[in-house]
Amino acid sequence: MVENGAKAAKRKKRPLPEIQEVEDVPRTRRPRRAAACTSFKEKSIRVCEKSATIEVKKQQIVEEEFLALRLTALETDVEDRPTRRLNDFVLFDSDGVPQPLEMLEIHDIFVSGAILPSDVCTDKEKEKGVRCTSFGRVEHWSISGYEDGSPVIWISTELADYDCRKPAASYRKVYDYFYEKARASVAVYKKLSKSSGGDPDIGLEELLAAVVRSMSSGSKYFSSGAAIIDFVISQGDFIYNQLAGLDETAKKHESSYVEIPVLVALREKSSKIDKPLQRERNPSNGVRIKEVSQVAESEALTSDQLVDGTDDDRRYAILLQDEENRKSMQQPRKNSSSGSASNMFYIKINEDEIANDYPLPSYYKTSEEETDELILYDASYEVQSEHLPHRMLHNWALYNSDLRFISLELLPMKQCDDIDVNIFGSGVVTDDNGSWISLNDPDSGSQSHDPDGMCIFLSQIKEWMIEFGSDDIISISIRTDVAWYRLGKPSKLYAPWWKPVLKTARVGISILTFLRVESRVARLSFADVTKRLSGLQANDKAYISSDPLAVERYLVVHGQIILQLFAVYPDDNVKRCPFVVGLASKLEDRHHTKWIIKKKKISLKELNLNPRAGMAPVASKRKAMQATTTRLVNRIWGEFYSNYSPEDPLQATAAENGEDEVEEEGGNGEEEVEEEGENGLTEDTVPEPVEVQKPHTPKKIRGSSGKREIKWDGESLGKTSAGEPLYQQALVGGEMVAVGGAVTLEVDDPDEMPAIYFVEYMFESTDHCKMLHGRFLQRGSMTVLGNAANERELFLTNECMTTQLKDIKGVASFEIRSRPWGHQYRKKNITADKLDWARALERKVKDLPTEYYCKSLYSPERGGFFSLPLSDIGRSSGFCTSCKIREDEEKRSTIKLNVSKTGFFINGIEYSVEDFVYVNPDSIGGLKEGSKTSFKSGRNIGLRAYVVCQLLEIVPKESRKADLGSFDVKVRRFYRPEDVSAEKAYASDIQELYFSQDTVVLPPGALEGKCEVRKKSDMPLSREYPISDHIFFCDLFFDTSKGSLKQLPANMKPKFSTIKDDTLLRKKKGKGVESEIESEIVKPVEPPKEIRLATLDIFAGCGGLSHGLKKAGVSDAKWAIEYEEPAGQAFKQNHPESTVFVDNCNVILRAIMEKGGDQDDCVSTTEANELAAKLTEEQKSTLPLPGQVDFINGGPPCQGFSGMNRFNQSSWSKVQCEMILAFLSFADYFRPRYFLLENVRTFVSFNKGQTFQLTLASLLEMGYQVRFGILEAGAYGVSQSRKRAFIWAAAPEEVLPEWPEPMHVFGVPKLKISLSQGLHYAAVRSTALGAPFRPITVRDTIGDLPSVENGDSRTNKEYKEVAVSWFQKEIRGNTIALTDHICKAMNELNLIRCKLIPTRPGADWHDLPKRKVTLSDGRVEEMIPFCLPNTAERHNGWKGLYGRLDWQGNFPTSVTDPQPMGKVGMCFHPEQHRILTVRECARSQGFPDSYEFAGNINHKHRQIGNAVPPPLAFALGRKLKEALHLKKSPQHQP
């Protein structure tokens, strides 16, 4: 639309069309034009013959304006100049770029839109309007509607006047900004015009307050009254000129607007304010936009001057400045609230002005050992600040980078851009006990008790806030990148710097008190408040001075704190009262610097810049080191983010010295908190997602109408299955088309690029048409890779089609690329790649056709990229694998009854009479029905496992057609223990079933699969946790009429499943069944040694991933790399055969590549090189080399990823610090057979998927097959919600593992990954509607563990009770002693709260009594933490905080630091008054009781919270083992 407009803009004008030749008639009343622009350039238009033809569609489209006017004319139109309504319009310049209306003063402006009759008419065709793709030029614009109080915007061309009604969606933001300016003008007019009841003699504060009230209603454009004030002031010049234009038509008794003092004052104030501009622009005409301070130095510019045209550059600069302001205001924001005088700006406190209120300079000194706060917390991805953990800080002090004490007042209370104040702090950190500081406390600077906590130094403080309540109580908190700290008492030395802040808070609260008692807050102006404060008694805590001037000075210099208190006050009338307007105005008048408030997401600086870091005995381990990479990984990521070489030493140095601040989400590299109500991963939920289930339908090809010579080249090679002759080559218009090559075809959609198809075979049809059958070659940018794809790489798909050779547009330069793979070929392939890149660049420079290549098959329905089936493609045999896949899918979707009517096929499964089957639980009613509950991590009521039945017979229906409605199936139901009672389920084996006489007839579509049911004595020897086999046992009979269980009667002889593998049976001992004690200690058969892969575990943690893979019999973790000492020690304790490197992986990779003689291929920092050189010879000797490592797995830390959405071409240095680059470089250098990446689920979606895409692109460039998916650990046998993203990579000749089947019911939806073109992929189905086994509950998991008290630290204990549940028996194994059943100590207040939380499901802080309690030290505290009720509405009621677990529910996501006020606040034992123990958390993750953890209790919780649940790792390992066996099978042998 805009492009067409740009073309139309260049047409020349000819005499006006006939529509102008009308008789003179009386003119209708036109709106008064204010500040209308009239002096413009001329531009001609030309009426072409084509305009006489109108194509009728849903809305008529014409190219010429006069035709649109003629088609929309009404019989009632009598005016000599037409007026029309204008909808769906865009205003743009001659280049087709959308422009604000005021740019008419600089450029020619044209219009595109739907022209409608001037009034609503009954003619439906005319009321639809006529779209004119480009018309104008716009001659001038005007605003009317002043008397009505609602602005009407008019634009005029030479032919007509247009009432602008509704802009196009793409133009709405631009137009809405201008409309709000018009609204402001009308609002000011109504307040000043006597004819409208206004008063031209009011003051500026009163005028602004009135305008705020007027504009607050009916507009979502402004987030607060303060934002409206800022906007009105900024547009003072515009408003003045609009009202000045009304003087010509003003009534005699009306005042001249140009002489109204308040309007002149508004204009002057507008010319003085700072209008921030973030950057200088140099437009094509050479105009340079100055910073605001520079503009302010020159004389104020008015619209009058602009109209005169005396200074085009200035005029253009001011209009561009206004456009910048619009863009700044329209930045998207979440949960915006009025946080200062404006949501756009924060006025900086001037240190010189407040210096007299503070003591003389002093410096921070301490003899205490302090720990870097970044060691205590982890953070990953972007997160809103309210989701950070909350702590208390006692005995604290704040200082700058020189350790000089500094006031908190100098730091903005909102997160802002370009802050030039660096404030750090130190103190004693404890858990947040919810305590407040009383304003009546006479000694706020002394510590009444010695806090029991850790001495820490903080990273840079980013913002702070004040909270206050009744009874003169106040709380002040500060935020760093990793936590919120509620401030307790400061240190004695810092107390003098603290008192002014508290005093200002008291003053603000006192002013609020003044206003609350007034019947109308508008009665108190700034002067009134100043007078009242000066009249306070000297003993009043808000007393400043008896001198009003001193009070005014204090209010203004400390005004930003007071404005913040008003901004968060819940009463809108108070927020925009005259006092606030007056104070904000006085702050503006002092010309304070403004900071722009930015989006509130947290950013982590890996290097703590606190000056204490260099002196602290506990050095920070969080120092960021640029990732060590191979050149291949460095190139892929570097080219994406930067155009310069990251290996340039000058730029590398600059990057190392620069700040490394990126946004991230709270948590750590592994930890992720699940939120309720999440239904997927995609951020854009407007379009309906389409899940990939089968290959796409072929694209619609545009047939060719041209005539070209087409003939076969060569003889026929054979025939298709239909007897049609096959050919190898054909000449199409002189171009050779060959089987195995590629051709381009035009598609119906003109916006799409030509489709490229791989030629499978060519044939001549029976009607003598020359045909081609091809498979679609997908461009990389249209796959999940997006912009990370190589523009020359195509991917074969399973989408195929047949078309005529005459439809071919051209022949593509294309090759199937196959290169030798393995670490020994890396250098050879690098050389070949360089030559290929050079050739491609040369062709691009010469504008030659692109040479495409294909290495992989892309299968979105399988979620991955696979090796090309080279033996099956391009054979010219008339056979197509894609067609076969489609035929198989069609067969799977149909039902087929066998001839004997004893079996049938459905969904690809063959069922026969006497088979044991799964039945959808919704198809068979349960004994007890329940409903799901809504509290966090609640009960599993309503979640039911599949019903196990035996197929007895097939019941035909009257219909003879074999479809879903032609027959039913009769089945016998087996009951599960949970069908009887919760107690029975708890004490029974999860694989146990009960025989019954109940039968039911069901449709075959109710069946979900097959399973086996055996006698208990026939169960396999290698039973293991977690379950991966569909095998059950049955020894008991359930009488549903009596609800009783008994041994199977002799007359009941169920026909159990036939056992095909006798090696899985237990060895019988006489006639009796093996005892339970003996069965528990039988060890599973050890898997063959040759199948275990030599594994390198990177970012190994305590070893959860390695443990599960090892248990699956597929991995031998010979090497592990872990940065944290306690975690590395835990890994070593549980994997004594492994060589564990407790070091930075960047250093280890550098050392390995040096050992292999490949340091030239290594991109690393000087620091990494030096540390690698310091490794001992013994350490170096144990380093693995390429060829020794078969499998690499790990979960790289994620901090900093989310910051990439802010990266530009100069931000490559920030990306280099990401550990995923090093992780991928290990894969590139070693080229193992298999590679597994694990991460939090948002890894695939944050940063618009760029990191995920680059990871896939890197692995594909190495030559790997790749697949991706998200799994829920709760569906694999743990009682915990933990969603994790995985990426498998396999060497080209290997088999990619499938995703493990979820075995347990768990209440989560499908976990989808966004692909492209609105498609989504889910690795596995959701088990919310059924699975083979029931969910594991909290009681199943920890019900047998002995009671412990709050703070119990005894590491070794006895079990005291026997294991009851199936899970408990499996998790205990042969362990005799219970270890790590220890819990964190809560402080006295939280312990009291815990004891008051009821021991019932769903109980949390909402159940606390609303009263106070006196602690042992005499302090009086509220039972309900103060911050929860005040902020509950914004945080889903803080559901789960101080929450108890439910015996029948599941655990929330395991975190590294369980606490009642943490991100996962549900951490109280279901019955005992304490936080969960280390062992209980370990069990929730599926760690066996024999697993050991290292370090103190915080280290152990951290190790567990960061770990991959071993049962999930086991399930992945089983599928890897299957893939290894599958490779050895005959069908996969070359």
UniProtKB/Swiss-Prot annotation:
Tissue note: Expressed in flowers, embryos and endosperm.
Enumerate the active-site residues.
1198
Q: Where is this region: Disordered?
A: 1-33, 321-341, 647-717
Q: Which UniProt keywords apply?
A: Chromatin regulator, DNA-binding, Isopeptide bond, Methyltransferase, Nucleus, Repeat, S-adenosyl-L-methionine, Transferase, Ubl conjugation
A single GO CC term, please? nucleus
Biased region (Basic and acidic residues) positions are: 706-716
List the subcellular locations: Nucleus
Where is the major localization of this protein?
nucleus
User: Compositional bias (Polar residues) at which positions?
Assistant: 328-341
Q: Which InterPro entries match?
A: BAH_dom, BAH_sf, C5-Methyltransferase, C5_DNA_meth_AS, C5_MeTfrase, C5_meth_CS, Cytosine_MeTrfase1_RFD, DNMT1-like
| Outcome following mutation: residue 1300 to S | In met1-1/ddm2-1; reduced activity
SMART domains per the UniProt record, alphabetical:
BAH (SM00439)
- Span of domain SAM-dependent MTase C5-type: 1093-1527
Reaction catalysed by this enzyme: a 2'-deoxycytidine in DNA + S-adenosyl-L-methionine = a 5-methyl-2'-deoxycytidine in DNA + S-adenosyl-L-homocysteine + H(+)
Find the cross-link Glycyl lysine isopeptide (Lys-Gly) (interchain with G-Cter in ubiquitin).
599
Statement: the UniProt record of this protein carries the keyword Ubl conjugation: yes
Enumerate the CDD domains for this protein.
BAH_DCM_I (cd04712), BAH_plantDCM_II (cd04708)
| All copies of domain BAH, residue ranges | 735-869, 909-1049
Q: What is this protein called?
A: DNA (cytosine-5)-methyltransferase 1
Q: Which organism is it from?
A: Arabidopsis thaliana (Mouse-ear cress)
